[in-house]
């Protein structure tokens, strides 16, 4: 009886983690970690500016418009243009040029970290995160999920929602597919937050230069991509 239950449990767990060995999912894991690192690095090193999304930036732009802060408004608009430009570029390269963008993404992320580590602390923080805004946006256009799941690697709101929905549905109905969904998004959340933690630690230890630590997970992703 015990052996039979053990076999059933092992089979369920194997099905639950059946995506864990795919190269796409491994890359997704690493880039989720990197996405958390990039976000935290920008926040910790540049006055709390989150480079990986536009909701806060555009809301702040409306505040600048209301207050008549013209220069700050231009910086915010520039931030949005840089972010949007990376999305346009990733779309053109993917759809019209037929390029596999993964290796391009690694290079752009690495270049952004190098540039950010060289920019002076006195530079306007919004302008200073432009390189990371471009890199994060390009990463979003490149790594948008794996194994049939749509999942961002640069921010986690939708990942949190899908994780909660997946486990809620599983608890309610016992649907194995819902459990797999919850596990997938749950692991993505954990890795993103682990990367964010490393980002804060890196800045705490090395200041702006701490961003170079983010090259380590990029190297791991490059290894998986080339093997």
Summary of predicted features, one role per range:
Residues 2-227:
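Alpha-helical transmembrane segments of multi-pass membrane proteins
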């Amino acid at each position: 009886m015990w052996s039979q239950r053990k076999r059933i449990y092992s089979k369920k767990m194997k099905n639950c983690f059946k995506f864990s060995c795919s190269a796409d999912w491994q890359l997704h894991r690493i880039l989720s970690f990197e996405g958390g690192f990039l976000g935290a690095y920008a926040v910790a090193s540049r006055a709390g500016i989150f480079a990986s999304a536009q909701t806060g930036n555009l809301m702040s732009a409306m505040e600048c418009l209301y207050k008549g802060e013209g220069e700050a408004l231009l910086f915010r608009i520039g931030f949005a243009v840089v972010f949007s430009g990376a999305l346009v570029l990733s779309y053109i390269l993917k759809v019209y040029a037929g390029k596999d963008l993964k290796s391009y993404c690694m290079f752009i992320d690495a270049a952004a970290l190098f540039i950010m580590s060289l920019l002076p602390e006195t530079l306007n923080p919004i302008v200073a995160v432009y390189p990371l805004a471009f890199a994060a946006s390009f990463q979003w256009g490149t790594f948008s999920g794996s194994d049939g799941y749509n999942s961002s690697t640069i921010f986690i709101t939708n990942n949190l929602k899908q994780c909660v929905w997946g486990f809620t549905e599983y608890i309610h109905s016992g649907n194995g597919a819902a459990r797999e969904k919850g596990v997938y998004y749950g692991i993505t959340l954990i890795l993103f937050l682990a990367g964010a933690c490393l980002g804060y630690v890196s800045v705490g230890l090395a200041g702006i230069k701490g961003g170079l630590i983010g090259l380590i997970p990029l190297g791991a992703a490059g290894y998986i991509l080339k093997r």
